[in-house]
């Protein structure tokens, strides 16, 4: 900011009737109807500086602004300065904050060496567009891209040749374009250089309510002894440019940041490895080292998680082993239910075989067989059960036992009574696949019973009045008694075999 080349329009002291030679501005415009090829203006050194010729009638005149103690007296007379009242209401320049103005005033001071060497090197040229009433010439002389000034000229009509402006403050953002052009040694070279102006640096200044300046550069600051000649655009073209340039500058900055971040990734990974494994406790000045140190606490929880997972797996294996062990023991110790075994033809259920064992029945049967005693209570119970079974469809009407009338043969009668009143025989008759029930039902010796009696010993009651139905008259003997006795012996053998099989199943199940 302190170099001699950095000069711009002063801010707060700029007015129409300023007497300070270092701060006054003169505005000279070329006539629109001029037929001359060039307009020559005297420079402070005495040489005439030509401007670009305005030969096209469609284009507006070009305005040249000379600054900073170049001319002792203005080229425009006092009469020309006094215009209509409307000229005083025109929009003015946008200026910078006070520090930037002070530095610019110091540079513009004639005592400054840079200003004495090149007093006329700073010039501002505003080219207006055709048909637009608002002209926005802007200038930037700051090298560090921190301060810039924008000027707004609003002549009333295209025919008016001179316009005087007043300063105005605004909060809008301004884009400043600065160029570097050599001081022309001759007149033709200056005109060619003005036509071939190249943009060197773009500076975007944001002005807020506190007159704070924030600048963003799209390129690095360049220093040199070259004079800066800024070509200022009009307001209409100026309003269209900031959005594109803002996006380009932001895109450039974001692209640069991405490239730098991508380039730093492998370097940061190497640094992280070196810091984590080589120098875990030391501090590093690099940002990558800080990132690596910041990543150190993350490794601790992962190791803890892995250590926690191992006991979980061990505990699960132990619990599974215990579960399998208990399951195997439970299989060995748990008694099997009788319902789980498939039904076997000719074999009664184990739970019921205990109640109807043949061991206590044999002495009773033998006792009844040899003594000839018969129990009236059992006979009455048998007859009552036969009378109550009306729902049994398989009961034969002629299946009632026909006993012989001769009472001299008690063994035959006792055998018939044992088979008719025994629980074992009634259960064997209930099984559909039992061969015993099929043989007995074909011969018609025993009556079929669907519901077994609970106990063999029944309470003694009065005999039924219809007990004499079993004794049929007209029969003198029992020719089938020997056959029945053989069948009884065969059935007992079969029952004993079935009972042994049932006992084996019970022992295996327990």
Curated annotation (Swiss-Prot):
Skewed-composition ranges (Polar residues): 50-60, 97-109, 118-135, 414-441
Pfam family, any one: DUF4641
Feature: compositional bias, Basic and acidic residues: 78-92, 379-395
Stretches of the chain forming a coiled coil according to its record: none
Region Disordered, annotated ranges: 1-154, 208-227, 234-276, 368-480
Annotated InterPro entries: DUF4641
Residues with PTM Phosphoserine: 43, 84, 120
Record's keyword terms, sorted: Phosphoprotein
Low complexity bias (residue ranges): 139-151, 243-255
Protein name: Uncharacterized protein CXorf49 homolog
């Amino acid at each position: 900011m302190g170099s001699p080349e950095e000069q711009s329009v002063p801010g707060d002291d700029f007015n129409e009737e300023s007497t300070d030679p270092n701060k006054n501005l003169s505005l000279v415009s070329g006539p629109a109807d001029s037929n001359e090829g060039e307009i020559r203006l005297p420079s402070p050194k005495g040489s005439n500086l030509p401007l670009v010729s305005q030969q096209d009638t469609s284009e507006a005149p070009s305005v040249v602004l000379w600054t900073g103690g170049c001319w002792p007296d203005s080229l425009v007379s006092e009469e020309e300065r006094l215009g209509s009242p409307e000229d005083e209401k025109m929009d003015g320049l946008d200026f910078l904050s006070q520090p930037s103005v002070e530095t610019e005033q110091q540079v513009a001071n004639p005592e400054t060496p840079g200003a004495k060497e090149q007093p006329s090197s700073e010039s501002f040229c505003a080219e207006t567009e055709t048909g637009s009433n608002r002209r926005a010439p802007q200038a930037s002389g700051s090298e560090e891209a921190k301060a810039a000034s924008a000027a707004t000229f609003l002549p009333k009509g295209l025919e008016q040749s001179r316009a005087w402006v007043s300063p105005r403050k605004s909060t809008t953002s301004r884009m400043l374009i600065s160029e570097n052009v050599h001081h022309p040694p001759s007149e033709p070279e200056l005109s060619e250089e003005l036509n071939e102006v190249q943009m060197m640096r773009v500076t975007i200044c944001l002005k807020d309510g506190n007159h704070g300046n924030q600048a963003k550069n799209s390129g690095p600051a360049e220093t040199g002894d070259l004079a800066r000649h800024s070509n200022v655009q009009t307001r209409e073209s100026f309003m269209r440019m900031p959005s594109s340039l803002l996006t380009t500058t932001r895109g450039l900055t974001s692209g640069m940041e991405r490239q730098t971040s991508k380039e730093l990734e492998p370097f940061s990974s190497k640094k992280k490895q070196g810091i984590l494994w080589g120098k875990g406790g030391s501090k590093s000045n690099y940002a990558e080292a800080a990132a690596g140190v910041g990543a150190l606490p993350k490794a601790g929880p992962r190791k803890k998680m892995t250590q926690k997972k191992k006991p979980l797996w061990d505990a699960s294996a132990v619990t599974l082993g215990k579960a399998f062990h208990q399951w195997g023991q439970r299989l060995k110790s748990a008694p099997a239910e009788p319902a789980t075994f498939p039904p076997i033809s000719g074999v009664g259920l184990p739970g019921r075989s205990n109640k109807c064992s043949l061991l206590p029945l044999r002495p009773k049967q033998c006792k009844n067989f040899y003594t000839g005693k018969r129990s009236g209570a059992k006979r009455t119970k048998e007859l009552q059960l036969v009378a109550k079974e009306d729902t049994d469809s398989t009961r034969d009407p002629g299946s009632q036992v026909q006993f012989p009338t001769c009472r001299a043969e008690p063994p035959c009668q006792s055998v018939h009574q044992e088979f008719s009143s025994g629980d074992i025989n009634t259960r064997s008759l209930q099984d559909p696949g039992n061969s015993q029930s099929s043989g007995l039902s074909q011969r018609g010796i025993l009556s079929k019973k669907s519901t077994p009696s609970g106990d063999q010993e029944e309470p003694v009651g009065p005999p039924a009045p219809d007990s004499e139905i079993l004794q049929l008259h007209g029969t003198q003997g029992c020719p089938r008694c020997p056959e029945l006795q053989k069948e009884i012996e065969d059935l007992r053998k079969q029952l004993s075999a079935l009972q042994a099989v049932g006992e084996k199943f019970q022992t295996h199940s327990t």
